[in-house]
């Protein structure tokens, strides 16, 4: 019996060491992330849309899929109107803290939006770039919405530096699978998404169960999505 307890304690100690080693590795190498290349960004958009199912695709395949099914547009965030593709990103302004829930520090008037077409060129999704500062880093994601502009079809984080096994679980399929069908705005088109850590009895269409042990990351995800 005593031998069994020793084995259990040894295994627990070993797991703790592995966890600490992972955290140390993360802290040492988190600064090495660089701005994603065009191919990486294209791949992330295709993953978010569901057109790309795995990472085992060459650059040519990614480029062909992107050119065939993705239509990049620019939108004026102040007016909500489409603008010409050759309009440069202008009019960036600093944000006061009380008007900067996503902690992005400045916002540009012109932003990119990606439309996903089917084979008959009918729009199937509207993909919004979402980013904001959370617990450990600025996280970048693509948020595909139904053409109604309210209903989530997926949430795909493609660059983040959150703590392994905690905030970094924003990329886990087990957490992401609850997003399809959620609403990001209410019937009055006001931001309404909630991410809760309290595991409510009834999770409605506006509520997502947060990541256990990663309250700051969960709150940051909520703020950044509601901002954009």
What positions do the PLM features span?
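Flexible, solvent-exposed loop/hinge segments and secondary-structure transition points
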Residues: 2-228
């Amino acid at each position: 019996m005593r031998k069994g307890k020793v084995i259990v304690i040894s295994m627990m100690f070993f797991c703790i060491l592995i966890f600490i080693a992972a955290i140390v590795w993360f802290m040492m190498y988190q600064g090495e992330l660089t701005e994603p290349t065009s191919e990486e960004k294209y791949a992330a958009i295709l993953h978010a849309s569901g057109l790309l199912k795995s990472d085992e695709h060459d650059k040519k395949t990614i480029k062909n899929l992107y050119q065939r099914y993705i239509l990049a547009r620019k939108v004026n965030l102040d007016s909500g109107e489409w603008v010409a593709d050759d309009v440069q990103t202008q009019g960036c302004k600093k944000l006061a803290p009380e008007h900067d829930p996503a902690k992005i520090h400045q916002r540009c008037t012109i932003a990119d939006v990606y439309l996903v077409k089917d084979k008959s060129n009918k729009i199937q999704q509207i993909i919004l770039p979402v980013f904001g500062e959370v617990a450990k880093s600025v996280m970048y994601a693509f948020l595909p919405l139904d053409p109604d502009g309210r209903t989530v079809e997926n949430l795909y984080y493609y660059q983040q530096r959150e703590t392994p096994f905690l905030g970094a679980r924003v990329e886990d399929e087990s957490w992401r699978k609850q997003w399809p069908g959620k609403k990001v705005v209410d019937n009055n088109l006001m931001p309404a998404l909630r991410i809760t850590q309290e595991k409510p009895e009834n999770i409605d269409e506006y509520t997502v169960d947060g990541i256990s042990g990663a309250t700051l990351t969960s709150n940051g995800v909520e703020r950044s999505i509601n901002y954009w």
